[in-house]
From Swiss-Prot:
It comes from Shewanella pealeana (strain ATCC 700345 / ANG-SQ1). This is Thymidine phosphorylase. PROSITE patterns: THYMID_PHOSPHORYLASE. GO terms for biological process: pyrimidine nucleobase metabolic process; thymidine metabolic process. The lineage of its organism: Bacteria, Pseudomonadati, Pseudomonadota, Gammaproteobacteria, Alteromonadales. Homodimer. It is an enzyme of class 2 (transferase).
Length: 443
């Protein structure tokens, strides 16, 4: 029998907690025998004194096991259960293509996603732009769509990881969100509760990233790779660039359009293509569906070019209640804003830097993101045809198009976009889309 206050005292004194102590505390978070004040105190103690890898693995697995852990064995699936998670960015529409692409190559992708947070867009918000699509199906429908389509992208259900829900809301209110140990456990407990065989982790770097510096992003990537593999799920983290909008657009319906165009081959943004392929290829290799990255890329290009990935996306959409002809006729179903107008730079030069976070906040201001949880969204608004770093710019050429519902919203977004996209005299050095891979063997 343990006492919550003794566990807090140990961590306050920078001692190591045992697996049993961590399990006891997490059980208390779940069944409310540990108070909000005690949870906040442990969060602050961990924030200042950190946890070693064994403690992080114990916290992650205890939180994973605080609710239902999905088990796919009864479905007799003939492929690995694989997934991807991103720390979030702007124009990060990868999940919409990656899930169907991986499924088309023989994987099964039960992707449990989230809504938008701060300046970053949420995968579920993009799907909510599709009429009829149910992001909260019951367990039977979720399993049915995973089995039949190979992929289902839905929201976190009430019985998955209840400990994280309570712990996260308290961390959010007590300034302990930024602990690498606690971020690792929060992300991985949710992902590993989906019963995964393998996971590719996309950790963003740059002005639109969740972590403030490259070093902090790398530290998080190393922690996630170590803890996930330690918890028994093959995992690789990729450090990817978020110093500019990843797709050509940002905004819910706009990103869905770009994702469908990507899968049908109508348009593939080269940066988006590189990061999507890097993550998806790693999933195939970790899941045993390809022996190396080049073989994985050949398979992925094949399912893009022969239409199989697009077909699977359509099957997932209709399986979860959306229109059966969505891929063919998406423009019929997705909303358009009242105003669609270009923004121009005030001078000639090169797009030399981008404050990606500010561009994400411009989408929030337009109504495409939340200022507080529970806010209703306007799925039609956002930015499209956003210029890329290194593009030559002149005052007659748009740096982006703004999709707004009112003149005042347009004017506010226009000022934000002009401020966020810096025009310089010289072309900036090209940054890689993927900075590095962190595999278990690199730790």
């Amino acid at each position: 029998m343990f006492l919550a206050q003794e566990i807090i005292r140990k961590k306050r004194n920078a001692e190591t907690l045992s697996t049993e102590e961590i399990q006891f505390f997490v059980k208390g978070i779940t069944n409310n025998t540990v108070s909000e004040g005690q949870i906040a105190a442990l969060g602050m103690a961990v924030y200042f004194n950190d946890m070693n890898m064994d403690e992080r693995i114990a916290l992650t697995t205890a939180m994973r096991d605080s609710g239902t852990v999905l088990n796919w064995q009864s479905l007799d699936l003939n492929g690995p259960i694989i997934d991807k998670h991103s720390t979030g960015g702007v124009g990060d529409v990868i999940s919409l293509m990656l899930g169907p692409m991986a499924a088309a190559c023989g994987g099964y992708v039960p992707m449990i996603s989230g809504r938008g947070l701060g300046h970053t867009g949420g995968t579920l918000d993009k799907f909510d732009a599709i009429p009829g699509y149910n992001t909260e199906p019951d367990s039977a429908l979720f399993r049915k769509v995973v089995k039949e389509a190979g992929v289902a992208i839905i929201g976190q259900t009430g019985d998955l990881v209840p400990a994280d829900k309570r712990f996260y809301s308290i961390r959010d209110n007590t300034a302990t969100v930024e602990s690498i140990s606690l971020i690792t456990a929060s992300i991985l407990s949710k992902k590993l509760a989906a019963g995964l065989d393998a996971l590719a982790m996309d950790v963003k770097v740059g002005t639109g990233a969740f972590m403030p510096t490259y070093e902090a992003s790398e530290e998080l990537a190393r922690s996630i790779t170590a803890v996930a593999n330690g918890a028994g799920t093959k995992t690789t983290a990729l450090l990817t660039d978020m110093n500019q909008v990843l797709a050509s657009c940002a905004g819910n319906a706009l990103e869905v359009k770009e994702a469908v165009d990507f899968m049908t081959g109508a348009y593939r943004n080269p940066r988006l293509y590189e990061v999507t392929m890097g993550l998806c290829a790693e999933m195939l290799v970790l899941g045993g569906l390809a022996s190396n990255e080049s073989e994985a890329r050949v398979k992925l290009n094949t399912v893009l070019d022969n239409g199989k990935a697009a077909e699977i996306f359509g099957r997932m959409v209709s399986g979860l209640g959306g229109p059966a002809d969505f891929v063919e006729n998406y423009s019929k179903y997705l909303p358009d804003s009242q105003i669609i107008r270009p923004v121009y730079a005030d001078r000639s030069g090169f797009a030399s830097a981008m404050d990606t976070r500010e561009l994400g906040l411009a989408v929030v201001t337009l109504g495409g993101g939340r200022r507080k949880p529970g806010d209703a969204l306007d799925y039609s608004v956002g930015l499209s045809k956003v210029c890329a770093l290194g593009d030559e710019i002149n005052p007659e050429q748009p740096i982006a198009f703004i999709h707004a519902q009112s003149e005042s919203a347009f004017a506010e977004a226009e000022a934000a976009v002009k401020k966020a996209i810096h025009i310089g005299d010289s072309k900036p050095e090209k940054t890689p889309e993927i900075y590095r891979y962190i595999r278990e063997s690199d730790l």
